[in-house]
From Swiss-Prot:
Listed HAMAP family: RsxD_RnfD (MF_00462)
Cofactor(s) required, per the database record: FMN
The protein's name in its UniProt record: Ion-translocating oxidoreductase complex subunit D
Naturally occurring in which organism (per UniProt): Escherichia coli O81 (strain ED1a)
Membrane topology per record: Multi-pass membrane protein
Pfam families: NQR2_RnfD_RnfE
C-alpha cells in the first residue's frame, strides 16, 4: 500500500475568498450609511464610480494576461478595493480622482504584482496615498457634517458637483465648505492640526462647532462607531481575527493618552484620535487585509501595534492630519520581517 504525503496546510477554513470578501462588503453597510447620513449622497456616487472603475480595470488586465475574467471578478476583491477607496476620499471629490485612484490601485498596486494574494501593499491605500500626494487640496475638501453644515447637497447637486464642480444653483466646493465660523477644514483632525499650528489653545479649539459631538468631532464620532459596529460583526462572523484591531486601538489609545497628559496644549485627546478620521475603518477593514498583514498571531499583535504607533506619530507630528493610510503602508513593509521572527516552532524541532 502506498501512502501519499500531502502538503500543508492540513486543516483549513472552508470559506471561499469570494465569501469572505462579501462578508466584508456587508459589514461596511453601517459605515456607508453613516457617511451618507452625515455627508450626503456624494459617498454613494463615489462608491458607484469606484466599483465600476475597479471591475473594468481588473477585467482589462485579466484580458491582457489571458486569464479568466468572469472567474476572477467573482472573488469580489476588486469591488472591495473600490469601496475602501471610495469611502476614504471626500464625498464631492471630482469624478476623475476616484477613477484615477481606483485604476491605479487595481492595475499598479494589485495586478502588476500578479493579482490577489501577491501584492505586498494594500491596494486601496496605495490609490489613496497617490491621490493625497498628487491632489492634496481636493483630498482634504471634506464637507462639514450635516449637524453643523449650512447646506448639504442633495443627490442631483452631489452629481453636479462631482462631474462639473458646481451645484445646480451655481455654488462650488468653496461655498459649500465655508459657513461654519469661517472654518474650511471640515474634519476634526484637520481643524485641530491647523489651529494648533496657528497658535490657538486647545481650549479655544474645542469650542469650534466641529467638536460639538458628545465624544469627539460632530458626525465623525458616529461614523467611526458605525464602522466599529461593522468590525464587531466581522469578528462575530470570524471573517477577521481580533489581534490586529485590538493591538492597533490599544496602542493608539495608549500613545494618545500619554501624549495628551504630557502635552495637553498641543496634542489631541485620545477620544479625538479614536473617533475621528479613518480610525475604525482602518482597524477593522484595512489593516486586517489577509494578504498584506502579518500571518502569525504574535505577528498580528506587533503589526497592529506598529500601525497604531505610526498613526499617532503622523497625526501628532507629521504633515498630514490623518495618518492611517501611510501607517498601513509603512506597516506593510515590515510584514516579511515580522513574520520571519514570529514563525511558530515546528513540532519536534528546536527553536532557532
Amino acid at each position: 500500500m502506498v501512502f501519499r504525503i500531502a502538503s500543508s496546510p492540513y486543516t483549513h477554513n472552508q470559506r471561499q475568498t469570494s465569501r469572505i470578501m462579501l462578508l466584508v462588503l456587508l459589514a461596511a453597510v453601517p459605515g456607508i450609511a453613516a457617511q451618507l447620513w452625515f455627508f450626503g449622497w456624494g459617498t454613494l456616487v463615489q462608491i458607484l464610480l469606484a466599483s465600476v472603475s475597479a471591475l473594468l480595470a481588473e477585467a482589462l488586465v485579466l484580458k491582457l494576461r489571458k486569464q479568466s475574467v468572469a472567474a476572477t471578478l467573482k472573488d469580489n476583491s476588486a469591488l472591495l478595493t473600490g469601496l475602501l477607496l471610495a469611502v476614504s476620499i471626500p464625498p464631492l471629490a471630482p469624478w476623475w480622482m476616484v477613477v484615477l485612484g481606483t485604476v491605479f490601485a487595481v492595475i499598479i498596486a494589485k495586478q502588476l504584482y500578479g493579482g490577489l494574494g501577491q501584492n505586498p501593499f494594500n491596494p486601496a491605500m496605495i490609490g489613496y496615498v497617490v491621490l493625497l500626494i498628487s491632489f492634496p487640496v481636493q483630498m482634504t475638501s471634506w464637507l462639514p457634517p450635516h449637524e453643523i453644515a449650512v447646506n448639504i447637497p442633495g443627490f442631483i447637486d452631489a452629481i453636479q458637483v462631482i462631474f462639473s464642480g458646481h451645484t445646480t444653483s451655481g455654488g462650488d466646493m468653496n461655498t459649500l465648505r465655508l459657513g461654519i465660523d469661517g472654518i474650511s477644514q471640515a474634519t476634526p483632525l484637520d481643524t485641530f492640526k491647523t489651529s494648533v499650528r496657528a497658535g490657538h489653545s486647545v481650549e479655544e479649539i474645542m469650542q469650534y462647532p466641529i467638536y460639538s459631538g458628545i465624544l469627539a468631532g460632530a458626525g465623525w464620532q458616529w461614523v467611526n462607531l458605525a464602522w466599529l459596529a461593522g468590525g464587531v460583526w466581522l469578528l462575530w462572523q470570524k471573517a477577521i481575527r481580533w489581534h490586529i484591531p485590538l493591538s492597533f486601538l490599544v496602542t493608539l489609545a495608549l500613545c494618545a493618552t500619554l501624549g495628551w497628559l504630557f502635552s495637553p496644549d498641543t496634542l489631541a485627546a485620545p477620544q479625538i484620535h479614536l473617533l475621528s478620521g479613518a480610525t475604525m475603518l482602518g482597524a477593522f477593514f484595512i489593516l486586517t487585509d489577509p494578504v498584506t498583514a502579518s500571518t502569525t498571531n504574535r505577528g498580528r499583535l506587533i503589526f497592529g501595534a506598529l500601525a497604531g504607533l505610526l498613526v499617532w506619530m503622523i497625526r501628532s507630528f507629521g504633515g498630514y492630519p490623518d495618518g492611517v493610510a501611510f501607517a498601513v503602508l509603512l506597516a506593510n513593509i515590515t510584514v516579511p520581517l515580522i513574520d520571519y521572527y514570529t514563525r511558530p516552532r515546528v513540532y519536534g524541532h528546536r527553536k532557532g
